[in-house]
UniProtKB/Swiss-Prot annotation:
Catalytic activity, EC: 3.6.1.66
Official protein name in the record: dITP/XTP pyrophosphatase
Pfam family, one: Ham1p_like
Binding positions (Mg(2+)): E45, D74
Comment on bound cofactor: Binds 1 Mg(2+) ion per subunit.
Family: Belongs to the HAM1 NTPase family.
Keyword terms: Hydrolase, Magnesium, Metal-binding, Nucleotide metabolism, Nucleotide-binding
Quaternary structure, from the entry: Homodimer.
Length: 203
């Protein structure tokens, strides 16, 4: 049975971030899934101490609230010279992407060690309060001294990937899919999710 012959299942993305939802729609386009955004009025409190814990909390909460499978991603930037900050607080470091970038560059002013890594934890949960899949990906790089590139979102313009010498914001969608932390995590999730969907469609 090919993926096109499988019954399409609703998968709710546990996020209100339009850029993140758009990225997941592209990553999941080849699977028999109806990808939807979470309800706008649904707020999930991220109380975990790790990316994996937060992804699990979000996936379980959104799956129960919607009665559908939910995919949650908790990702963030950890800077070595800042003892791993902003870490799980990456999205709450300031009020907007521009302000978050400004704050981080200011905190690294005069610091030579600009090593950093992005982490992405993915979790899929069912409406029956079951964690179906969990994976985590990582991308090594450094923080630039100024923003570079017009694509992407979040900290993308100031994170230069070790393997390419370019920032995420300078990459095409295909390049970012190959090198990003979320792309690495999805490469682990994809075969497991395909297998899960096949099992669900067996009579």
């Amino acid at each position: 049975m090919s993926s096109n012959e499988l019954t399409e299942r609703v998968l709710v993305i546990a996020s209100g971030n339009a850029g993140k939802i758009r990225e997941f729609r592209q990553l999941l386009a080849h699977l028999p899934l109806s990808v939807q955004a979470q309800p706008k009025d649904l707020a999930v409190e991220e109380t975990g101490q790790t990316f994996a814990e937060n992804a699990r909390i979000k996936a379980l909460t959104v799956a129960q609230a919607t009665g559908q499978w939910a995919l949650a991603d908790d990702s963030g930037l950890s800077v070595e010279a800042l003892a791993g900050a902003p870490g799980v607080y990456s999205a709450r470091y300031a009020a907007s992407d521009a302000l978050r970038i400004e704050r981080l560059l200011q905190e690294l002013k005069g610091i030579d060690d600009r090593r950093a890594h992005f982490s992405a934890a993915l979790c899929i949960a069912s409406e029956t309060n079951e964690v179906l899949l969990e994976v985590e990906g990582r991308c090594e790089g450094l923080i630039t001294h100024a923003a570079r590139g017009e694509k992407g979102f979040g900290y993308d313009p100031i994170f230069e990937v070790d393997a390419t010498g370019t920032t995420f914001a300078e990459m095409t969608i295909e390049q970012k899919r190959q090198w990003s932390h979320r792309g690495c995590a999805f490469a682990l999730l994809d075969p497991a999710l395909q297998e899960l969907l096949h099992k669900q469609n067996k009579p």
